[in-house]
């Protein structure tokens, strides 16, 4: 009992200064920028988040989705970094491989990826490169030793289909021939 009284004596001055903080998000709207076209995977993620997330944020803000497609989410990432106010009211759902744009030194990159604050992920993607069994390439070492590497395709330079073989070519010396389109 004496310990409780002793602890209370020292804690009382601080307890009186504790009061409810105003709810920052109350009455506000969060804009969730989807870095892809309407109907795409990341647009669907953004709309699912917008539908439910506001209920779990103190102040229960409204959340709207704004599509800002183009350049594999590069337009959305550049917008968030350079134009959106850093007030916690604009967030984005972009293609996770966006950081490869900066690593590759693309001149269109207008952001510093490590300065983005990651909130969370809707899913996890594992990347796999596979090759037909009737080719001479049975292991990654075969691709490294090849005089002419296997062809692999990607829809564009901002995609994981481009960056994964490019990263392997530059880091471990594979010889993937990347065809875009």
Where are these regions (language model features)?
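Extracytoplasmic "Venus flytrap"
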Residues: 31-46, 69-72, 153-160
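Stable alpha-helical elements in mature extracytoplasmic
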Residues: 41-45, 49, 72-76, 96, ...
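Short N-terminal segments immediately surrounding and downstream of signal-peptide cleavage
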Residues: 22-33
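Hinge/capping helix and adjacent helix->loop/strand transition within the periplasmic-binding protein
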Residues: 30, 55-57, 79-90, 98, ...
């Amino acid at each position: 009992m004496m310990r409780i009284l002793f602890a209370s004596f020292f804690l009382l001055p601080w307890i009186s200064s504790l009061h409810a903080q105003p709810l920052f998000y109350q009455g506000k709207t969060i804009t969730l920028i989807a870095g892809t076209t309407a109907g795409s995977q990341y647009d669907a993620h953004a709309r699912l988040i917008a539908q439910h997330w506001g209920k779990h944020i103190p102040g229960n803000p409204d959340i709207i989705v704004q599509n800002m497609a183009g350049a594999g989410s590069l337009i959305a990432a550049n917008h968030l970094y350079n134009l959106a106010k850093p007030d916690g009211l604009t967030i984005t759902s972009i293609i996770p491989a966006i950081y490869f744009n900066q690593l590759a030194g693309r001149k269109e990159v207008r952001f510093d990826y490590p300065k983005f604050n990651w909130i969370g992920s809707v899913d996890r993607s594992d990347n796999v490169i596979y090759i037909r069994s009737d080719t001479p390439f049975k292991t990654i070492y075969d691709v490294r030793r090849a005089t002419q590497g296997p062809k692999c395709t990607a829809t564009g330079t901002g995609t994981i289909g481009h960056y994964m073989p490019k990263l392997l070519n530059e880091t471990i010396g594979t010889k993937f021939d990347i065809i875009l389109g």
